[in-house]
Amino acid sequence: MATPAAPASGVRNGAGPEWGGFEENIQGGGSAVIDMENMDDTSGSSFEDMGELHQRLREEEVDADAAAAEEEDGEFLGMKGFKGQLSRQVADQMWQAGKRQASRAFSLYANIDILRPYFDVEPAQVRSRLLESMIPIKMVNFPQKVAGELYGPLMLVFTLVAILLHGMKTSDTIIREGTLMGTAIGTCFGYWLGVSSFIYFLAYLCNAQITMLQMLALLGYGLFGHCIVLFITYNIHLHALFYLFWLLVGGLSTLRMVAVLVSRTVGPTQRLLLCGTLAALHMLFLLYLHFAYHKVVEGILDTLEGPNIPPMQRVPRDIPAVLPAARLPVAVINATAKAIAVTLQSH
């Protein structure tokens, strides 16, 4: 039993030198553990490096394509970009213009809104103030109340314009330097604004307690008497009737304004100067409106210049008979000449 085992062990122990290291490793290391520290660290990261490289190449290709596309768009859309910039500028200018117009409209509405309180009045109040403008009140110790609105005076001025137009058309007035409407509007508004400003200046010098708005309202309502007088006398052409209404109606409206100014002025000299100037201007303006646009003007011109006679007018005259023997032929000639003249005039 021991003899056959010897060769096996001898064979094993007598192995060649090429198997010596292997046997030493098997005999010396009884464990199959692999030392990971001695492994190459770069052996497992080769796939990751390839992925990063591929991704980098793709990004570079995308960037190159984008740059090329931008260059092509810049070359192709050069004129289109200029047009787009021009359209934006035009749109901006239109927006600015619309904004300016809107601001102007808003400012205009704001200005109209400022004037609204001066025209906010009821028709009943206007009617009562028209009647009060014809009734003078004697009250000197306290200032009389003056309406601070412009609706009634403005309507009276326009009414006076319409009456003047009616008077111009009925009297066949010829205005060479302007139209009838322009002349009437200029006359009425010029008197209202001009005289109001002048009297306000005198009131300031005379230390009267009245404002420009009150002066406009006072003189505007004072034109109510002028409207009544002119409306009646333009349709009824009687001088006596005009002078009667001029003294009564025009005088009442003037006395009303004078009473208001007297109550607001201190000192007899100042009162005389201010009230006398206003009364003279108001009454003379009514005379001017009557005689400037009435048929009386034509009668005055005819009286001063004489009747209209044609420059050359042929009148048949008798031929004097010098000798008694020639009386018969001369009588025949005169009769013939008269007959011819009558025949020519009939044709």
UniProtKB/Swiss-Prot annotation:
- Predominant location category: membrane
Chain segments carrying region Disordered: 1-31
Q: Which GO terms describe its cellular component?
A: Golgi apparatus; plasma membrane; transport vesicle
Taken from the UniProt record, the cysteine pairs bridged by disulfide bonds within this chain are none
Chain ranges sitting on the Lumenal side read 167-184, 235-237, 293-347
Query: Which InterPro entries does the UniProt entry name for this protein?
Result: tRNA_Mod/Golgi_Maint
Tissue specificity as recorded in UniProt: Expressed by splenocytes (at protein level).
UniProt membrane topology term: Multi-pass membrane protein
Q: Which domain of life is it from?
A: Eukaryota
Per the record, ranges on the Cytoplasmic side are 2-145, 206-211, 261-271
Question: Which ranges does the record mark as transmembrane?
Answer: 146-166, 185-205, 212-234, 238-260, 272-292
* Protein keywords: Acetylation, Cell membrane, Cytoplasm, Differentiation, Glycoprotein, Golgi apparatus, Membrane, Transmembrane, Transmembrane helix
- Subcellular location per the Swiss-Prot or TrEMBL entry: Cell membrane; Golgi apparatus, cis-Golgi network membrane; Cytoplasm
Tell me, which GO biological process terms does this entry list?
A: cell differentiation
Q: Which residues carry this modification: N-acetylalanine?
A: 2
Protein task: Involved in the maintenance of the Golgi structure. May play a role in hematopoiesis.
Give the family from UniProt: Belongs to the YIP1 family.
Annotated protein name in UniProt: Protein YIPF3
The species this protein belongs to is Mus musculus
